């Protein structure tokens, strides 16, 4: 059975990190050897770039600069972590991948989706086999304040209107890529969310 490349996406505070860890545990119990990773980050170089991106003033970088930084981090992540794991037969489960850049920088910060897609085509080219979009009311997500516990709150500081645009952007991506993107109700109980995700992934494994 070939390995799966799975990404979890969604607005800030939607519970992606928790559900990424639960999915990895579920796959491991079923005898698979998943690698859990995240973006920006997932490799030594990408983690260094992460600190530049997620900390500090909201206006620290222009949208164009963010696109280049995220892509540089993603390329290092892909070369040093994702591709080697997949080549060795391991599933990869990542908390965010290229869809986040499509939405955060491409759709909400100056309509730069075309630039994002051109750079992605040249430098990345890879897409997950399966993307799970955790969807919830941005007001509820912001009230959780998950990023603030770590100091990685730069994008939360853009406020509610920005998060509402993000939600709409992720919903639009699900319509654009229906074969790989699945929307999951992230306002449900964490156990119910995990069950929904496991059902979707289980179906994909059965098809492999």
Curated annotation (Swiss-Prot):
Name recorded for this polypeptide: Thymidylate kinase
Task of the protein: Phosphorylation of dTMP to form dTDP in both de novo and salvage pathways of dTTP synthesis.
Listed HAMAP family: Thymidylate_kinase
InterPro entries hit by this protein: P-loop_NTPase (IPR027417), Thymidylate_kin-like_dom (IPR039430), Thymidylate_kin_CS (IPR018095), Thymidylate_kinase (IPR018094)
UniProt-recorded Gene Ontology molecular function terms: ATP binding; dTMP kinase activity
Catalytic activity as recorded in UniProt: dTMP + ATP = dTDP + ADP
Alphabetical UniProt keywords: ATP-binding, Kinase, Nucleotide biosynthesis, Nucleotide-binding, Transferase
List of residues binding ATP: 10-17
Pfam families reported for this sequence: Thymidylate_kin (PF02223)
GO cellular component, one term: cytosol
The family this protein is said to belong to: Belongs to the thymidylate kinase family.
Any Gene Ontology biological process: dUDP biosynthetic process
Gene designation per UniProt: tmk
EC number annotated for this UniProt entry: 2.7.4.9
Superkingdom classification of source: Bacteria
Phylogenetic placement of the source organism: Bacteria, Pseudomonadati, Pseudomonadota, Alphaproteobacteria, Rhodobacterales
């Amino acid at each position: 059975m070939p390995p799966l490349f799975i990404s979890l996406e969604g607005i800030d505070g939607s519970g992606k990190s928790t559900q990424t860890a639960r999915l990895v545990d579920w796959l491991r119990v079923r005898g698979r050897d998943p690698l859990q990773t995240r973006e920006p980050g997932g490799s030594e170089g990408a983690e260094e770039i992460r600190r530049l991106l997620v900390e500090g003033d909201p206006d620290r970088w222009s949208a164009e600069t963010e696109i280049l930084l995220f892509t540089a981090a993603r390329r290092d992540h892909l070369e040093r972590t994702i591709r080697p794991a997949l080549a060795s037969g391991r599933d990869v489960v990542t908390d965010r991948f290229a869809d986040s850049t499509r939405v955060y920088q491409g759709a909400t910060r100056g309509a730069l989706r075309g630039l994002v897609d051109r750079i992605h085509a040249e430098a990345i080219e890879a897409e997950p086999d399966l993307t799970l979009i955790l969807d919830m009311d941005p007001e509820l997500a912001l009230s959780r304040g998950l990023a603030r516990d770590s100091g990685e709150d730069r994008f939360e500081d853009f406020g509610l209107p920005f998060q509402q645009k993000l939600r709409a952007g992720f919903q639009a991506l699900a319509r654009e890529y229906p074969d790989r993107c699945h929307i999951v109700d992230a306002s449900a109980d964490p156990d119910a969310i995990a069950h929904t995700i496991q059902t979707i992934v289980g179906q994909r494994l059965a098809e492999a």
